[in-house]
Amino acid sequence: MLTRKQYELLRFINERLKEAGVPPSFDEMKDALDLRSKSGIHRLITALEERGFIRRLPNRARAIEVIKLPELSQAAGNRRGFTPSVIEGNLGKVRTSTPALEDGERPVAVPVMGRIAAGTPIEALQTRSHTISVPADMLGNGDHYALEVRGDSMVDAGILDGDMALIQRNETADTGDIVVALIDDEEATLKRFRRRGASIALEPANTAYEVRILPPNRVKIQGKLVGLYRKY
């Protein structure tokens, strides 16, 4: 399990490697994560290396190799149904101009309906509070709403505490989908959905949490996860 800062740094390093072919400097990492000193970056780098997500190459300056990402750390069979699409801050990158938007990039107002637990289930969904703007091509067809994620039980699927989960309204789900599940009409939780015989399994993406096995009459599907909205 990664902390939020560890995950943010790992994503930043991976994106910079893809864009520039070289990892960011420690100063760039410090600025991107809004840390006061480079010692914090050293600790994060060490933690990521100890957990097997990166490797520092000896005798080379700024030589960091990303070995895996949390979203990719599970077997493909355990990830069916969702690959995170994330709207996020630009991590310090500056755009010199603003290009014209294509139709699919034009924002759509998505209502925020409260909070959802990625941990111990919390109270049922609340009423609409405000809206966020999301590119239309990120959502696809159907009706959508957003929920603020609370907890870390889905961190290995790339879903962090504080993210906005973008949900497509749906009352059914396929095995492997990440869903909003309403338990006993009282508790709402964000988990991976699986069928186990005549029962339903709600699986976390964090080994610190247990799978919940419930009869179908206790679980109502409220929607499926289609993306994440993340601000830095």
From Swiss-Prot:
Enzyme Commission code(s) on record: 3.4.21.88
Top enzyme class: hydrolase
Signal sequence extent: none
Keywords, in A-Z order: Autocatalytic cleavage, DNA damage, DNA repair, DNA replication, DNA-binding, Hydrolase, Repressor, SOS response, Transcription, Transcription regulation
Site positions per UniProt: Cleavage: A118, G119
Record feature DNA-binding region, as residue ranges: 26-46
Recorded GO MF terms: DNA binding; serine-type endopeptidase activity
Transmembrane regions listed in the UniProt entry: none
Domain of life: Bacteria
Binding partners and assembly: Homodimer.
HAMAP family xrefs: LexA (MF_00015)
Cited function: Represses a number of genes involved in the response to DNA damage (SOS response), including recA and lexA. In the presence of single-stranded DNA, RecA interacts with LexA causing an autocatalytic cleavage which disrupts the DNA-binding part of LexA, leading to derepression of the SOS regulon and eventually DNA repair.
NCBIfam families hit by this protein: lexA
Family: Belongs to the peptidase S24 family.
Protein name as annotated: LexA repressor
Organism classification: Bacteria, Pseudomonadati, Pseudomonadota, Alphaproteobacteria, Hyphomicrobiales
